[in-house]
Amino acid sequence: MPNEQSEASVLSRLNPHRFTTQIPQHPLSQNMQRRRNSVSSAASDSINSLKQSSARAVSNSNGIQKNNKKYMRSTVAGASGILPTYNKSMSFSQNKNLDDNNMRASLPVLERDLNANNFKSANNNPIGFSSFSQPYSGSRDPRPLRDKNFQSAIQQEIFDYLIQNTFEIDTNYPISLKTLKQPTQKSFVTIFKWLYLRLDPGYTFTKSIEYEVYQLLKILQYPYLESINKSQISAVGGSGWPKFLGMLHWLVTINLRLDKCLNTLDQNLLNQQTQDLTTLSKPVENIEDQEVRQEKYELMAERLFIDYITDSYKTFLNLKDDYSDHMNELKAGFERYLHIIKLDVNNIQSKNENMFEKFEISRNRVEKLKVARGKSTALNGDLVKFQKYVDSMKAKSEEWPIKLSKIEDELNEKKENIKLITEEISQIQDSLQRKGLSVEQIENKNEQKLQLEKEIDQIAEKADEFVSLIKSTKVDNEKVFVTFQDSIRQYNDLLLEFLTSRRKLGHDIEIEPLKITLPNEVVVPNSENALTMDKLFPTDHPMPEYYQNMLLSINSDIMKRIETLKTDNQELEREIGMLTEEINSRGSTNESLELKLSDLNLNLKNVRQENRAEILAQSLEIEKLERQITEGNKNIEQKIANAERIVTELLNEKEVLYNEHSKFKSDLNLKIQKLIKEAHSLRFAVKDSTNRLNELIFTESSETDD
């Protein structure tokens, strides 16, 4: 239950709605996702977002060249659509009950479940709402906007949507049905800005409202844009209000469908997180399961860092400098993350203990099996020997009659000998009785002799056991000493690697006092020259505190260098921001040049129409004015040649400007890539050094505690 509660608390803080149009994300490859560090990955993604913004501006310029009537804003829609592809590991759900305004702070798209292509209409509409964003082929709006009942219905829908989504709180502007029936210019502007900012929270209104409303509707591909002109936008009341009321209702419909998409994305992401945690709760059966679990842990840690960086960047965009709340959320998330890992470690330890018990049982069974096999082998050998003995006895049974006769003869001889011996025994007994000795006394002496022989055998067996015990103890001591030598050698190698890595980073430290040197000859214990702790660690200070203080001082130096590197990275980020502003200014210049080109093309079209009219008029009078027609044709051809020459020159000029812009963009990309490589190399070096130092500190602390 605690594990499930901790997983549920982690899921409760995951928020899939983490998208800002000012920060388009670039999906990373699978290998880069596994290797990148959680902190530096966010910086790399921010730099990639700047590159993607410039690429999107170029794609917009290409779209203008192909179609003079399309001018796309890079913050809302590009050639690939309004919904940018977002990596599935870049979104978290911190609070499922956030309001819709916070939900629109981001708009991620799952690579596995949802794709930007799913939102494209049949006409390749970049907005992606196929049912209501297709341009209307006619010039007339088919909706009955002049009908009072229809107006009341859509006014009620707009009013309900504004009230349900806290329009008055967000804008500090009162709203009522009367406002929608008798609008003012201010109320229309406020409602339009609020509805559009729900679609694109990163957009900032800077230009005149007439220009911006018309351009934004053009970007959104409002199907009835031909029924609205810029002059009407400056005064929306009166007879023209039904057109703008229908336009506001269209924006409300877009927002409602966007809400539905966001809910779908939220549910998909929650399902994905639940699947991830379900995978973590499953037992590990093989190496592949362990790798999958490791990837899940890395993704959880990356998501925590990305969530923190995204929130901090949004706070920075809002001109706020207090990031303490985001840091507290990051700490709380990591505490839950560590709790999950600890639970997993405890489960693994309990499984290891159970498996060790099973191993001991199996090992005992194997020992018993070995003993049984030895006994079986010995019995088989005895069986073979007994069979050979039986065979030999069968061969000798044929000789037994002769031997029996010999044995009978020998038996008779033995009987005679027994008689003689019996007589001798009686004589000996008589002599013993005369000497005062008895047979019982002699038997007692023999029994004492046998008892002493048994005791001698037992002492010899104990001596053999003691010798074998001494040999096994000596072997164990040699193994322990070899392990001790390997540990000392590994410790010194780690110190050298740590010193080498720090020197590569320009950090010269002294680690000679930390080295451990073994004497050439190790004397047996309990002697004057035996190896002791004082000889192994020759220092005047207490050993744990001395080494701990030295390691802490080295760690503090490394942390100071890390802080310095962070300051340098912040300066690099500021330079990147300046370069981004310069790219945006170049993009606006390119847009103005394209507008000029469209005007020139329009003038060229008018000139050609005039020339064709003159040619048609002269062709009617060809019989009467042949000479004049010939001269007129020459003049017309000359004018056409001049016009084409002018167009060619303008196209060449545009090509030159575009090449200059592409060259500048490529140079800037090279600089940014160089900065990314330097930041990555620096980050990997710092991470490697920090990990090794932590391992060294942990090893030293463990040895000190022992």
UniProtKB/Swiss-Prot annotation:
GO term, biological process aspect, one: mitotic sister chromatid biorientation
Keywords: Cell cycle, Cell division, Centromere, Chromosome, Coiled coil, Kinetochore, Mitosis, Nucleus
Protein family (similarity comment): Belongs to the NDC80/HEC1 family.
Gene name of the record: NDC80
InterPro entries given in the database record: DUF5595 (IPR040967), Kinetochore_Ndc80 (IPR005550), Ndc80_CH (IPR055260), Ndc80_sf (IPR038273)
Polar residues bias locations: 18-32, 50-66
Assembly behavior: Component of the NDC80 complex, which consists of NDC80, NUF2, SPC24 and SPC25.
Protein name: Probable kinetochore protein NDC80
Subcellular location: Nucleus; Chromosome, Centromere, Kinetochore
Low complexity composition-biased segments: 38-49
Coiled-coil ranges per UniProt: 402-472, 553-669
GO MF annotations in UniProt: identical protein binding; microtubule binding
Residue numbers spanned by region Disordered: 1-70
A Pfam family this chain is assigned to: Ndc80_HEC
